[in-house]
Amino acid sequence: MKTSNTKTPKPVLIAGPCVIESLENLRSIAIKLQPLANNERLDFYFKASFDKANRTSLESYRGPGLEKGLEMLQTIKDEFGYKILTDVHESYQASVAAKVADILQIPAFLCRQTDLIVAVSQTDAIVNIKKGQFMNPKDMQYSVLKALKTRDSSIQSPAYETALKNGVWLCERGSSFGYGNLVVDMRSLTIMREFAPVIFDATHSVQMPGGANGKSSGDSSFAPILARAAAAVGIDGLFAETHVDPKNALSDGANMLKPDELEHLVTDMLKIQNLF
């Protein structure tokens, strides 16, 4: 099994807010992330969702929607030169979102949805499939294979190098631990890395689903601890949601890190990787 650290050309860093709140808010976060984006040791992507389609409550803020959201992400791309990640929830969104996004992400709840995986894989974007909280990490190989066979029908089995070449990644974001809690089984990083590059989502891994009366809560203080552990195990990159004012974020504020906290964490993770 692969136990060494980064296999991708550079460690990947995916950072940004959970959901697009406004263009002004995106800019304020993007500016704060410039030191990380300019770090030549990192392959940086700015992330934000145009629609949070799986919010706990109907009343919760979802985002500006596909058209307006992509316009704002394109503005960030043009103004800052950042590569972009966004997630899609329905097949028809894939080809449109791929005109802006360099990575299209499949949400954890939808990680087995064949039509969605196929639609995303038919674009030129990197495919980042989040492991469902309910999934055996070994079974994520079948989601990877759906994407790989869409891109190259001759592929018969998933493997790390094949997935890397074809731009198919997996993302660990914790597993259900009873009701309203998640736990990270670090073995899953090594298991999934047998058949794809693996990104560790440090902030959603500390989420407490549905733990705040109609919305999810969490404890961001544990995110750096889990991220440093993941770096020691061996991963290809870090996913971390960040906000200049997490307490007033419109989604997942309890899990988010401030940009300066993320910068310190990434410094620690790079030091850990250098030990191996």
Curated annotation (Swiss-Prot):
<comment type="similarity">
    <text>Belongs to the KdsA family.</text>
</comment>
<dbReference type="InterPro" id="IPR006269">
    <property type="entry name" value="KDO8P_synthase"/>
</dbReference>
<dbReference type="GO" id="GO:0005737">
    <property type="term" value="C:cytoplasm"/>
</dbReference>
<keyword id="KW-0448">Lipopolysaccharide biosynthesis</keyword>
<dbReference type="Pfam" id="PF00793">
    <property type="entry name" value="DAHP_synth_1"/>
</dbReference>
<comment type="pathway">
    <text>Bacterial outer membrane biogenesis; lipopolysaccharide biosynthesis.</text>
</comment>
<dbReference type="GO" id="GO:0008676">
    <property type="term" value="F:3-deoxy-8-phosphooctulonate synthase activity"/>
</dbReference>
<keyword id="KW-0808">Transferase</keyword>
<dbReference type="InterPro" id="IPR013785">
    <property type="entry name" value="Aldolase_TIM"/>
</dbReference>
<keyword id="KW-0963">Cytoplasm</keyword>
<dbReference type="InterPro" id="IPR006218">
    <property type="entry name" value="DAHP1/KDSA"/>
</dbReference>
<dbReference type="GO" id="GO:0019294">
    <property type="term" value="P:keto-3-deoxy-D-manno-octulosonic acid biosynthetic process"/>
</dbReference>
<protein>
    <recommendedName>
        <fullName>2-dehydro-3-deoxyphosphooctonate aldolase</fullName>
        <ecNumber>2.5.1.55</ecNumber>
    </recommendedName>
</protein>
<comment type="pathway">
    <text>Carbohydrate biosynthesis; 3-deoxy-D-manno-octulosonate biosynthesis; 3-deoxy-D-manno-octulosonate from D-ribulose 5-phosphate: step 2/3.</text>
</comment>
